[in-house]
């Protein structure tokens, strides 16, 4: 009975505390007053690519040009051969002279703001009270929230840019799937039946559209709670990828049966696909020090039938600045 009374009392206290009306002071609410430059350190990305599954690190950057446009750049590279599956297999089963390349990816692009406007909305904020840290464990396990009026900035954009990536590929499996064979300059087939690999270099561009939502607001409740902030920047996008340049390195084989003569086998018998698509999203915070994430799914240009990919990247930390270092000066 005593235990039941204690639980009932604590529950009543939590309910009473949660039902209290909240008054607050608005500190700021301006989705246009965001930082201009964001620099990302990406300790982790994972790329489930039908051509080559890989994981690694990267760097990225975003720059916002007022309400006119924004620009982004990204570079990614596999950690080591153990996280670059096609390259690792190529080294373990190397029977040719080609050097397997590490997976690398580079992208540079921009978004023109076709429509960039502010509108009224509501923001849901999670409440945290100092009382939660004073043994009120019941309340701490039932997060409360409040909804306050705020502004949101919505951007409809037109995207364009370029990309390039370099990767090792399992040429033996690809030629078997496509039912083609490598032949040398004399028309003789490749003499080795074990696995052999080469490198693929793809260069192209993209064009698409995006939708962004930006909030940049903070309130200070009169008592009981800390400062509540919502400064999230979220972007979703859809792009068409076009790669006019898809290069497969010629396979070079030193044939021991022909006095170690170097024989060359062109890989142009492999079918490629010059276009693809992707659907993605990115999120970050308008803070001097924060974190961000991004995800994409789609099909990359390159080897026909091996373009599907799903990629996730995490940025920690993300540094940002308003790039406003001027100060007012007054004469005495």
Regions found by a protein language model. Name each.
Residues 14-38, 119-151, 219-231, 321-332:
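Outer-membrane beta-barrel biogenesis signature
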Residues 21-23, 163-294, 299-303, 316:
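Outer-membrane beta-barrel transmembrane domain signature
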Residues 35-37, 51-57, 100-108, 154, ...:
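Residues that define the transmembrane beta-barrel architecture of outer-membrane proteins
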Residues 37-45, 57-59, 73-79, 126, ...:
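Transmembrane beta-barrel strands of outer-membrane/channel proteins
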Residues 67-73, 116-121, 217-219, 285-295, ...:
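Repeated loop/turn-to-beta-strand initiation elements of outer-membrane beta-barrel proteins
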Residues 106-119, 306-332:
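Outer-membrane beta-barrel "beta-signal"
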